[in-house]
Amino acid sequence: MSLLKYSFSLTPPAPPPAPVKHTYSFTEFLLELSEAWRQHPTDEENALHFVSAADQAAIVISADFYDIPEDKALGTAEVAVDSRLDAVRQSGEGALTVLHRAIKPHSSGGGLEMSFAAETEGGHVHLFLGYVTTRKVLNFTMICPPGKEKAVALFNATVPGFRPRLP
């Protein structure tokens, strides 16, 4: 009777390399983006633009600095969200459908968190996250090509890299 001997390697395969991230550190926020995103020049004061050719998407981050009394924060947030939605309406992309709109206290207690998701008649998806604190309004907007599910997936993959410094 012959005994056969077998050996198996149980060493798991090496994990895939972590995606390369670029870190942008500013006084008001920290931003980590995948290598697909490139900073795009802008003349806008207190604003940064990033473009991903692979995703055909854009990110605009802006900040407006002024003293905001606590009792005026909610009104300021309402105006900020409404003005951004109005700007999309006036962009010439057709009718706008607001899919989500919210203003709530930030979990840190450092201000209010604003958000909306909207889709234009032309199909572009606009996703917005912003903050109102006692000293600023900070805005993160992502504009994506048609396709809500893909846009939301890109936003959800990207926005954890946006870390505002509150207040």
Language-model regions, residue ranges each:
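N-terminal targeting sequences that direct proteins away from the cytosol to non-cytosolic compartments
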Residues: 1-74, 79-113, 119-125, 132-167
